[in-house]
Every structure is written in structure tokens, then in C-alpha cells.
């Protein structure tokens, strides 16, 4: 395997369409576009892409990237250079397979990128992404409706290109090469495209422009790397190209279409929930965030470990998040099937996890070969479904990769020696070499990680020699992760960064430095000009963060009990869990469309990459922003929230990534935060009714165990998705349920939830002002229980069908009781509003459930503390 050739061909795949970006900005080319040039390279963008190579590729590699210029005309290189011709063939094939078709379309002017969510499940809404760098503030990255997708002022493209070109000159120039080898150069080129081409369409002529240049380019690079790693010979590539041009021919070339050219790989870390939440409540605020970041790093480094172990670049990591990852790798390894190598790598990872965590964590790894035919539209979903079937099978035996003798050791391992050995108060394991308060060294390091991440503006990943195994005596999360050949560090500022780089200079082989600060990007604090002494790649990484600091010096984070004390009304903290509904089905079936010719499926690897990356943008960037808006709007205890810094007053984001989130906060802040996140999500997915999100909220007293809180919130989320525990058993719902929130034990669709919130807000304000008797909420709740018991009794006795409307004494009791309460009210507007609520009760019996929930909510928000503190009312 030629490692340099793999990287060069991946780079050629990454840059093959750079000319499209340049031309849309009005950028000139080094050569004149005429008939000779057209005959030579076929399309203007190919010539412009070559101009980009000539300007930004270092001289030592520039001459080995001819495939960029000739990816539409490989034959023009046949008699010039075998290596160049092979590369051009590889890039052309990879380009076709990435787009899911033989793409030979004409060119046009500037166009906008359509959000991939605007077309899922038959939705057809013209929403387009702004031409903004990925590191820009979250509120600037939402799609918006546009009448004319091609009506983009050249100035917008020119501004984006200007920023991109400036970064390219700083990070890819000859002057920076003292800190770059080919691998770090490819990584930096990758991060540059991610930063600036995530919002640029790949193609648009005769096509819907819903795949970004970044996603198409990275998929092309991944396929090119696979073809090169498998050492595909030119004659075979020529046969495949002929077969792709004429896929219906039954000649000898057709066989190439059904020969696997790559392998889809899926990984799933198992045991995450138990590892995250099986900790004491006392230390939860310190430990939970560190544990979630550790698992995030573990998932990503495990994915990169597989990619590195197969000699592939970062482009072949299609997605990593939420404990899952997806890769595209070659079909062979050292003359054998790649599955054998994958199994060996999996065994290494599972061995390490068993050593470090005693079998609590495992890795399910599965793969399936994919043929050229399956890359094409109408077929890719078959390979994707096949992979997930294999993943489900692999998850049944997450430790199955262990040797039988080692598996017996892990399963039969005792829980400790007993006796006088100290037990860690966080994880409950026997503690050796821990802190004075008996916290074991690993838990102490995870607490430290949570604090580091809360302050960090940079993340540094250093390539180091791979540790042979993670010893059971590992003292920190860093020592565990070192078995992946990575040393991970977080830095607050340039001074910290310099100290980390100095410390790593003697033991690391190369560095990757990622800026985590929103709105600053790759150029923050002169990052590009920093002399790291080692080969270094640089980039920007979206990173969700929301921290309730106790002080402006950021020395301590509020505990969960602190958050409960800050709550309005009753002293409670809470957990909010949210995740996307039916995501697996959306990915499998979202691009299917029925027309006069039947059912078509436009899913391709590039579209899959686009949807996955878009979800990452929302959860890694927009969730924290939306939550901060809700926190800042609450106006509680001064101006503690700061959207620019991730400083929150009453919310602590423990995890956001993949397709879900876990957030802790003062109980009363959580429902409004959930509503704000849901509204932001709907805007982000172009108000597509098929792409929804659900939420579950659990309210807890101080000192309540976090593992129980997590399960209660998960149960609430499950109830929301099933639409149980509330109004939904009375009526069927669209979308198979889901698209709902469960709060105070009641499941509501989001519109009903907002109606309830408005009623609760008014009621709480009236109670605070003394405009209504304090007995009003209890009167409403008694009516609700009368309705509930009467309905249940009638159903049990067979006098009422489950979905039939129930009328009974509760109706006139409601009219009497609440009207009597209203008669005691002096404010005319308040009196009229309450009477309106009563008049609406018989028209839809779900109204009594909504009103009861509002009454309960208002009562909790205005309840006095036992210590005699003043009420903290309002919603």
C-alpha cells in the first residue's frame, strides 16, 4: 500500500471541484478559457480547480495532482504519465459514485445551497443556506426561504471566497510547511472546506442543489482513497468507467458494476447510559459533563483508530457522534479481505475498553461491501439498510471480539476485594491512588476534564506512539485514550496552547489544533501563524457548550442543588432529554419519492453525508444558542446568561450531538428551553412535518440520584414519543405519534404545549398579583380528577368507548366551581378570560387536561419555600 499515493489521490478528490467555488465568486483563472482548453479539460471549473492547485498546493506535491485538472478528461493523460492517468481515472470514478450518477452537466452562475431537509419525505420547500463560514454565530446559519435559488449576488460569493482564500494562504502556503507533512496538509485542506464550502452547492444545473461542495468533495475523496488503497489497476478502472457510461449493456464491462469497490463500516459504543449516569448525585455536576465529553472523544478516536489502522485519511470518517460512527474503507488489506483487519482492530479496541472499564463499555463493529451499482441513486439505500442490519446483529455481542479466555475473565471478574479498601463515592468502584475525599483517579480526571472543556477555546490532538494496552492501573482519561495513539488536551488561550505544544514537542509526531470558539474560526489568536514545531493541521470544530458558572472568574460550576435553589417556586432541578423522531427511517426512506413512474430513491453517499453533517451543525452549534436565548429571556437573578460566551445562569448542557441532547437546569427553565430548541429545530429543518423532535422533562428534589433522574427523563421522552400519559390516547395522531413533549406527566403536541404555557403564565401572574384566589389551581385540579375518574369508570363499565367523548357531572361542576371563583375576582379582564376557559371545556374534553396542567404548572411556580423565602413566581 502506497500511503503517499492514497493521500494525494484523496487530496485530488477533495479539490476536484474547487473551481466551482472560485468561478461563482468571479475569481479569475491562470489560463484562458477557449476551445483548446475545452478540448483539454472539458469544463471551465476543471481549469479553475487546476488554477487553485497551482496557487495553493506546495511545489513538492503540485505536480502529482493532475487528476484535479483532468477528472473529466482522463484520456488526455494516457500517453503522458501512468500515475497521473491513474489518478484522473480514480477521481472521475469517485466523482461519479459520490454523486450517485455519471455527472457530466453543463455549468452555470452562482446558486444557493438548498437545505437537505427541504426535500426529505416529499417535502418541497425552497429553503436555502446562507453563504457564511461555519464558525459564524449560530443564528446566522439557519436556512431561509428564497424565491430564486440562482439569484445570488456575486458579492456574497466573493466575500465568502475572499475569507476562504485568506485562510488558505495562511494555512496552506509554503511558509507554513515547516509544520506540515502531507497528512496534516490534507487534514487542513479538509477543515478549510468544512469551514467555507459547507454552504456552497456542489452541482445545480438540471439538479436540485441540496448537496454541499464540502460533502460531495469529502465523499469523493473517501472513495478515491478506497480505490487507491485497493490498488485498482488502470484497465479495471477503464472497464468500470465504460460500464458506468453504459450501465444497461450486458458486455464484459458490466461485471465491474457488481464488484465491491469499498466497504461501509458502522460502529456503536455500547454501555453508554450506564457509564454516564451510574454516579452519585453529590458529584454529578462535576462528573457528568466530563464523562459525556470522554465518551464523545472515545467514539471519535475509536473511529479514527480504525481509519488510521487501514492507512486512510480523515476524509474516510463519514460521521461520528452520539456514540456512533460510519466509515468508508477499502475492500482488502494485505491481500486478504478487509473484514479480517477490521475484526483485529475491533479486538484491540474492545480489549482496551475491557481493561479500562471492566466490560462496562463495548464496541459493536459491522461492515458490508458496496458495489458501484449500489452507489447510484435508487440503490444506495440497500447497502445502508444492510449495514444497519449487521450493526443490530453486532450489538447483541458487544464483547464478542474478545478471545474466549479474555471474555471469561471480564465476565467473571469480581467487583472488588472487599475489606477496608476505599470505595469511590462517584462511581462506586474500589479506589486506589485517588484524592483525599476517596474519589478514584479516573473519576477525578473526568471531573477535571469537565472543567477544562467548560473553559476551553482550543482542542489539541497529538499523534503519539500507540500504547500496547490500557493498564488497569490507568490513572486518567488521557492514559486510557493514549491506546488509540492520541494525546488529547484542551487550552483556554494562546498561552495554554503554547505550553501544551512545548510539552508535546518531544513525544508527539504531529498535532491537530482545533478552534472551539464560535465566531472566531481558524484565525483566532493568530492560530495560523503559531509555530508548533511539529507537523500541524488546524481547523474549526463546532462544540456544544453551556455552563452555569458560580462566579465571573469561572472557578466553580454550579451544582445541581444550586440550580434547584435558583428555581422559581418549588425548589427543584430537572433533566431535559430530547431527540429526533424516526431518524433511522428518515435516513433509509427520506429520499424516496412516488411519481408516475413508480417509487424512486435519490439517496446517495453525498446526500447521506449532507444530512448527517447538517444534524451535527444543529446539535453541536444551534442547540446551545437556542437554550441561551431561553435562559437569557427568563430574566432570573440578573443578567447571568451570555450568548456570546456560552455562560448560562440556570442551564448546564451535559451533551448535545448526534440526534439527541441531555440538559440539566432549574426546573422552571427547562420547559421553555425545550420549546425554544424545538422552534429552532423546526426552522433549521425548513418546517418539514416529517422531521420532528420530542422532549421529556423530569423534576427532581435536591440530592436526587442522577442515574434515576436520567431514567425518569428518558421515560418521559418515551411517553412523549408514544404520546401517552396525556391527551393523546383520546385521538389518533399523525406521524405515528412523537413530535411531542412530556412535562409534569402529561404528553402534549408542541402547539398545545405552548397554549398550556400561556395559560400557566397568566395564572401564575394573577396569583402573584393577588388577582385570583390562591385556591383557583386546586379547584381546577379537583375538577380534572373528577373528569378523569368518571371517564375511567365509564370505560371500565363498558358505558364508554376509549376514544369516545365523556360528558358527565364534571361539566356542570366546572361551570359552577370556576364561575364561583370568578365571581370573587375584581379585574374584569381576568374574570372574562377565566370564563372563556370554562366555556371551552365541553367543546373538547382535552381542554380540561390542558387547563389542569396549566394550573399545576402555575401552582408549582408560585409555591413558597419552606424556609420562608419570598415567592419566585412567573413563567
Short names for language-model regions:
Residues 1-323, 328-875:
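Charged, helix-rich terminal subdomains or tails
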Amino acid at each position: 500500500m502506497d500511503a503517499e499515493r492514497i493521500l494525494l489521490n484523496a487530496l485530488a478528490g477533495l479539490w476536484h471541484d474547487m473551481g466551482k467555488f472560485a468561478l461563482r465568486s468571479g475569481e479569475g483563472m491562470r489560463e484562458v478559457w477557449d476551445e483548446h482548453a475545452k478540448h483539454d479539460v472539458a469544463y471551465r471549473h476543471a481549469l479553475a480547480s487546476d488554477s487553485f492547485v497551482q496557487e495553493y498546493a506546495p511545489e513538492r506535491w503540485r505536480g502529482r495532482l493532475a487528476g484535479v485538472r483532468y477528472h473529466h478528461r482522463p484520456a488526455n493523460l494516457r500517453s503522458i504519465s501512468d500515475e497521473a492517468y491513474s489518478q484522473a481515472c480514480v477521481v472521475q470514478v469517485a466523482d461519479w459514485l459520490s454523486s450517485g450518477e455519471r455527472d457530466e452537466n453543463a455549468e452555470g452562475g452562482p446558486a444557493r445551497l438548498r437545505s437537505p431537509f427541504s426535500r426529505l419525505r416529499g417535502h418541497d420547500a425552497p429553503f436555502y443556506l446562507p453563504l457564511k463560514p461555519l464558525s459564524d454565530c449560530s443564528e446566522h446559519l439557519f436556512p431561509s426561504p428564497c424565491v430564486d435559488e440562482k439569484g445570488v449576488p456575486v458579492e456574497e460569493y466573493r466575500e465568502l471566497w475572499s475569507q476562504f482564500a485568506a485562510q488558505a494562504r495562511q494555512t496552506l502556503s509554503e511558509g507554513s510547511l515547516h509544520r506540515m507533512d502531507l497528512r496534516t496538509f490534507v487534514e487542513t485542506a479538509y477543515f478549510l472546506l468544512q469551514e467555507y464550502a459547507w454552504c456552497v452547492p456542489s452541482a445545480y444545473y438540471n439538479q436540485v442543489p441540496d448537496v454541499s461542495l464540502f460533502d460531495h468533495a469529502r465523499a469523493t475523496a473517501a472513495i478515491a482513497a478506497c480505490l487507491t488503497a485497493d490498488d485498482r489497476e488502470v484497465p479495471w478502472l477503464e472497464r468500470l468507467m465504460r460500464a458506468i457510461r453504459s450501465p444497461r449493456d450486458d458486455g464484459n464491462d458490466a461485471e465491474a458494476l457488481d464488484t465491491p469497490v469499498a466497504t461501509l463500516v458502522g460502529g456503536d459504543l455500547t454501555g453508554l447510559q450506564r457509564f454516564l449516569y451510574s454516579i452519585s448525585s453529590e458529584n454529578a455536576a462535576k462528573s457528568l459533563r466530563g464523562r459525556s465529553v470522554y465518551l464523545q472523544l472515545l467514539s471519535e478516536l475509536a473511529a479514527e483508530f480504525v481509519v488510521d489502522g487501514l492507512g486512510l485519511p480523515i476524509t474516510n470518517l463519514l460521521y461520528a457522534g452520539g456514540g456512533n460512527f460510519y466509515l468508508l474503507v477499502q475492500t482488502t488489506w494485505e491481500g486478504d479481505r478487509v473484514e479480517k483487519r477490521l475484526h483485529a482492530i475491533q479486538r484491540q479496541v474492545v480489549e482496551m475498553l475491557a481493561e479500562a472499564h471492566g466490560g462496562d463499555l463495548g464496541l459493536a463493529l459491522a461492515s458490508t461491501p458496496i458495489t458501484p451499482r449500489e452507489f447510484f441513486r435508487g440503490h444506495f439505500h440497500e447497502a445502508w439498510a444492510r449495514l444497519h442490519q449487521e450493526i443490530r446483529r453486532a450489538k447483541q455481542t458487544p464483547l464478542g471480539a474478545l478471545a474466549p479466555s479474555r471474555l471469561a475473565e471480564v465476565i467473571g471478574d469480581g467487583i472488588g476485594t472487599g475489606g477496608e479498601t476505599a470505595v469511590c463515592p462517584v462511581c462506586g468502584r474500589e479506589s486506589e491512588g485517588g484524592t483525599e475525599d476517596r474519589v478514584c483517579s479516573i473519576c477525578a480526571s473526568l471531573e477535571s476534564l469537565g472543567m477544562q472543556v467548560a473553559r476551553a477555546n482550543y482542542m489539541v490532538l497529538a499523534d503519539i506512539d500507540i500504547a500496547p494496552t490500557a493498564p488497569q492501573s490507568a490513572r486518567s482519561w488521557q492514559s486510557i485514550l493514549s491506546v488509540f495513539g492520541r494525546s488529547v488536551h484542551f487550552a483556554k488561550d494562546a498561552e495554554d496552547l503554547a505550553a501544551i505544544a512545548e510539552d508535546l514537542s518531544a513525544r508527539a509526531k504531529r498535532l491537530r489544533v482545533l478552534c472551539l470558539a464560535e465566531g472566531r474560526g481558524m484565525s483566532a489568536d493568530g492560530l495560523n501563524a503559531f509555530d508548533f514545531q511539529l507537523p500541524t493541521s488546524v481547523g474549526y470544530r463546532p462544540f456544544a457548550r453551556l455552563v452555569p458558572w458560580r462566579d465571573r472568574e469561572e472557578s466553580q460550576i454550579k451544582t445541581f442543588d444550586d440550580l434547584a435553589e435558583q428555581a422559581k417556586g418549588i425548589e427543584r432541578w430537572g433533566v431535559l432529554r430530547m431527540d429526533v423522531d424516526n431518524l433511522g427511517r428518515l435516513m433509509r426512506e427520506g429520499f424516496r419519492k412516488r411519481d408516475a413512474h413508480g417509487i424512486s430513491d435519490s439517496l446517495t453517499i453525498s446526500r447521506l453525508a449532507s444530512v448527517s453533517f447538517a444534524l451535527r451543525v444543529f446539535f453541536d452549534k444551534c442547540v446551545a444558542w437556542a437554550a441561551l436565548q431561553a435562559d437569557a429571556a427568563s430574566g432570573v437573578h440578573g443578567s447571568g446568561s451570555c450568548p456570546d460566551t456560552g455562560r448560562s445562569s440556570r442551564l448546564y448542557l451535559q451533551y448535545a450531538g448526534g440526534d439527541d441532547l441531555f440538559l440539566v437546569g432549574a426546573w422552571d427553565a427547562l420547559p421553555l428551553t425545550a420549546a425554544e430548541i424545538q422552534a429552532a429545530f423546526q426552522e433549521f429543518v425548513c418546517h418539514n412535518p416529517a422531521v420532528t423532535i420530542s422532549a421529556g422533562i423530569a423534576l427532581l428534589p435536591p440530592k436526587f440520584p442522577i442515574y434515576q433522574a436520567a431514567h425518569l427523563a428518558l421515560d418521559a421522552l418515551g411517553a412523549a414519543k408514544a404520546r401517552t400519559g396525556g391527551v393523546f390516547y383520546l385521538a389518533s395522531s399523525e406521524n405515528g405519534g412523537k413530535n411531542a413533549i412530556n412535562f409534569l406527566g402529561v404528553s402534549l403536541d408542541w402547539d398545545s404545549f405552548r397554549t398550556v404555557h400561556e395559560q400557566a403564565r397568566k395564572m401564575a401572574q394573577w396569583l402573584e398579583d393577588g388577582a385570583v384566589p390562591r385556591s383557583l389551581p386546586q379547584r381546577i385540579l379537583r375538577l380534572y380528577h373528577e373528569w378523569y375518574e368518571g371517564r375511567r369508570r365509564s370505560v371500565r363499565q363498558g358505558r364508554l368507548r376509549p376514544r369516545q367523548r365523556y360528558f358527565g357531572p364534571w361539566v356542570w361542576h366546572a361551570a359552577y366551581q370556576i364561575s364561583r371563583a370568578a365571581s370573587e375576582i375584581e379585574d374584569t379582564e381576568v374574570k372574562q378570560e377565566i370564563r372563556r376557559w370554562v366555556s371551552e371545556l365541553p367543546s373538547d374534553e382535552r381542554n380540561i387536561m390542558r387547563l389542569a396542567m396549566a394550573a399545576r404548572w402555575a401552582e408549582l411556580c408560585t409555591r413558597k419555600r419552606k424556609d420562608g423565602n419570598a415567592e419566585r413566581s412567573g413563567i
